[in-house]
């Protein structure tokens, strides 16, 4: 598993993730890049779940973004529809956290597209820890989005055995 966290604050949207890949109880790799830029660097996305499944979903999502000229919500809904109805895709086990300048979304393997409250996303095994940390920092500090993501990932990595301290963080300017 993993931890992916996204925060939108003060004109910035940031998604960060750890780099640990496990096979059962064994750490296989510690520097996986689970956060990427898509669609001409106008969308950022992170994944939690099986690595091969997630890379497949990244490719499919990028195709949907191209098809819908970068419209994040439309591309997410269309990917979720395909994910729900296609027999091969239904077997993929991953969650995507995606964001552009206007919206932050979670796309699930059940075909759900969720726009979270307060534009805070935290998914994966360390998600609850990162979410609690990010929420506390959002409510009680003036830290920027990147700092909140960094600190939340650090806290999750200290608590969750499936999350490490190797972080990939991407950010975009935000209108929302």
Swiss-Prot record:
It is an enzyme of class 3 (hydrolase). GO terms for molecular function: metal ion binding; threonine-type endopeptidase activity. Na(+) binds at residues 157, 160, 163. The active site is at 2. Signal peptide: none annotated. Gene3D superfamilies: Glutamine Phosphoribosylpyrophosphate, subunit 1, domain 1. Its main location: cytoplasm. It catalyses: ATP-dependent cleavage of peptide bonds with broad specificity. It is found in: Cytoplasm. Its EC number is 3.4.25.2. Allosterically activated by HslU binding. InterPro entries: ATP-dep_Prtase_HsIV_su (IPR022281), Ntn_hydrolases_N (IPR029055), Proteasome_sua/b (IPR001353), Proteasome_suB-type (IPR023333). The keyword Repressor does not apply. GO terms for cellular component: HslUV protease complex; proteasome core complex. One of its GO terms (biological process) is proteolysis involved in protein catabolic process. Keywords: Allosteric enzyme, Cytoplasm, Hydrolase, Metal-binding, Protease, Sodium, Threonine protease. Protease subunit of a proteasome-like degradation complex believed to be a general protein degrading machinery. Belongs to the peptidase T1B family. HslV subfamily. A double ring-shaped homohexamer of HslV is capped on each side by a ring-shaped HslU homohexamer. The assembly of the HslU/HslV complex is dependent on binding of ATP. This is ATP-dependent protease subunit HslV.
